[in-house]
Amino acid sequence: MAQTGRLAAWLGKGKTFEIREYPVPDPKPGALVIKIALANVCGSDMHYWKGELDMEKRGRTMPINPGHEHMGTVYKLGAGVATDSAGQPLREGDRVIYRYFIPCGRCKACLRRQFKSCPSRQSNWSVTCDVWPHFQGGYGEYFYLGP
């Protein structure tokens, strides 16, 4: 398996992207690593790039690995991961599509399956790519999907 992977690190408002290389993380229990096959450019990504949304003013530490519309294949499974969210068996090499945000699964919105309304949801790509697990957005070779 690959030891390192590349991603596009966005340096911030008025700046550009830089290709960076980081170690491919081993997934924690309940997590997995996706080998990205396809990533789309969303309108919100264009707003960041044009400088219309200042991520640093929103409290983000730069650089970030943006991109939240992507799909790929399972590269590594963390301990305890045997099925997908529908209960179907999941193995390395399986094609998958997934959410870029992580809902809590316990609030009123989640229990109604309205995951985008979860007040506690977390977004991986809002964290700098300079810290583990590095691959937290769609513009790269891998994506770390947390438990």
Regions found by a protein language model. Name each.
Residues 44-50:
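Cytochrome P450 core scaffold surrounding the K-helix E-X-X-R motif
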Residues 9-16:
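Extracellular beta-rich ligand/substrate-recognition surface
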Residues 25-39, 53-111:
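Glycine-rich beta-strand-centered segment in the early N-terminal region that forms part
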Residues 21-23, 144:
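Generic structural detector for well-ordered beta-strands
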Residues 2-8:
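Short structural boundary motif marking the start of a folded domain
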Residues 37-38, 49, 146:
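A secondary-structure boundary/capping signal
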Residues 68, 84-85, 104-147:
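NAD(P)H dinucleotide-binding glycine-rich loop of Rossmann-like/cofactor-binding domains
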